[in-house]
Design a protein with these regions (language model features):
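Short, well-ordered amphipathic alpha-helices
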Residues: 113-114, 145
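Acidic/His- and Gly-rich active-site-bordering loop/insert found
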Residues: 1-99, 108, 115-123
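Histidine/acidic-residue-rich, glycine-tolerant segments that coordinate divalent metal ions
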Residues: 59, 80-82, 87-98, 105, ...
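Residue-level detector of alpha-helical segments with a strong bias toward transmembrane helices
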Residues: 112-113, 202
């Protein structure tokens, strides 16, 4: 298949992008270097429109090819406040911050898709590339939406994915309906008599 052959050709370069992003992780809404990296790559690929600073540090790129559906592809960019213990050439250079959830990979995959789609234009319509900040519990998607993401760049459908270590290389896992749950917070207050954990019968 032509697409697999092209990505095989790009593999080494794409791997370099991922390692660069992994070595320079940034926390929620602080993805300034990452956003600049993304925007520069999109410009290099010949993406038709590039919009920065959406919802803080979000980036949107648009690839056009005639009339047709508008399809959104989304990836997250932020890292976590974790000290990396790995020993590798691309270990985090930002002390106390690490790409422990694979968003460096997500960003890289969407950049790879952007390059391929911009090169080939083998579709009709528009592809909206959405690089989201602050996925890790800080409502980066909401920030982009509140900043007019879908008013400015409406889509007919939108797709995202999450890496899943343990899957065989070259395979993907899919299923009907939502596949990832969102987290929420709540507080509950209990009034009653307390006791020691070793003597719960006294409570």
């Amino acid at each position: 298949m032509a697409i697999l052959n092209r990505f095989s050709e790009m593999f080494s370069e794409i791997s370099t992008w991922r390692r660069d992003l992994h070595a320079h992780p940034e926390l929620r809404f602080e993805e300034y270097r990452t956003a600049t990296f993304v925007a520069s790559k999109l410009k290099e690929f010949g993406v038709d429109e590039i919009h920065e600073g959406i919802g803080g540090t979000g980036v949107v790129g648009i690839i056009k090819n005639g009339n047709g559906p508008k399809i959104g592809l989304r990836a997250d960019m932020d890292a976590l406040p974790i000290t990396e213990a790995n020993q590798c050439s691309h270990v985090s250079t930002n002390e106390g911050v690490m790409h422990a959830c694979g968003h460096d990979g997500h960003t890289t995959m969407l950049l790879g898709a952007a390059r391929y789609l911009s090169e080939t234009r083998n579709f009709k319509g528009e592809v909206i590339l959405i690089f989201q900040p602050a996925e890790e519990g800080f409502a980066g998607a909401k920030a982009m939406i509140d900043d007019g993401l879908f008013d400015r760049f409406p889509v007919d459908s939108i797709y995202g994915m999450h890496n899943m270590p343990g899957l065989e290389t070259g395979s993907i896992a899919v299923g009907p309906g939502p596949r990832m749950a969102a987290a929420d917070n709540f507080e509950i207050k209990i009034n009653g008599k307390g006791a020691h954990a070793a003597m719960p019968y006294q409570s």
